[in-house]
Amino acid sequence: KTLQHKIKNMRKKSNFFHDNKPFLSLPNNDIEKGYKLLNKYGIEKKDKWICVFNRDPSYLKSFIKKDWSYHDYRDFPIDDLKGAINYFIKKNYFVIRVGSVSEGSLSISNNKYFDYTNSSIKSAFMDCFLLSKCEMFFGGSSGICLFTASFRKPYFLINNCPLEGIFSIKRIYPALFKRIKNLKDNKILSIREMVDRDLCNIFTSEGFKIKNVTNINNTEDEIKEFAIEALNILINNVESKDKSLNHQKKELFKSEIVRDSAIRNLEYENPIGSSFLEKTFIK
């Protein structure tokens, strides 16, 4: 069976996390152990932190017996998160970069930023601890998101690709997707054109090459704007209602994406970042 077919079968129980209570928790002694390790880096029990994550090829490259480059279309550099990270810090949150393996580092000279991925305390246990106690997860879509969802922590995803991935499971928090550019004329395609050219559910880098298109990462400014929206949702303890977004634009977006045969059978009501959608060409 094709990779795309396997992925669609995995997504059938799309409401699993949304409709069920948390099924993972850490015992008190492990929680105390986690706080003790964090304290070495100046993060105390009373402090609040946000976990950030960028997907890059380093993790899959660690599996040397297989070529994982077909996943490269999902990657983006950590530098694109710099504006969002500085915003979170300005709002008095610690920001912890998570991930078991990563490429590159971010030049932020602030003790509220902790690059856990390149630290001496990195472990499977600390991965779980940090995600279970964070205020929210903010970053790219990958397997690490399942841990966040398992602990029912708010998670705001960026650079989702393909577009179908945003609607794979039921979400109450908005997300951003990668726009698509036509290589022949460098034109950024509208949502309608993406649907018409069957570009919403391609799951390999080669698939995009065959279609003569490429993905465009969310810009640093777009990600920062989304960070502002995410924190507003978090602080006000409300689901995303996209109150500032024109209702007509939302309905127009929905009317176009449901033309895709796969998306119409998924959670197409899932919210998109308000500011991002306002700037997206629909038709």
Locate each region found by the language model.
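A donor-sugar binding/catalytic signature common to diverse glycosyltransferases
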Residues: 126-175
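Surface-exposed alpha-helical segments enriched in charged/polar residues
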Residues: 39, 82-86, 129-132, 228, ...
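Short, flexible/disordered intra-domain loops and linkers
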Residues: 60-74
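Catalytic donor nucleotide-activated moiety binding site of glycosyltransferases and closely related
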Residues: 52-62, 78-124, 244-251, 255
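A short, charged/proline- and glycine-enriched loop
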Residues: 43-50, 55
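Hydrophobic anchor at the start of a short beta-strand
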Residues: 49, 95, 155
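A structural signal for well-ordered alpha-helical segments within the folded catalytic domains
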Residues: 79-82, 125, 142, 146, ...
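Leloir-type glycosyltransferase catalytic cores
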Residues: 1-40, 171-283
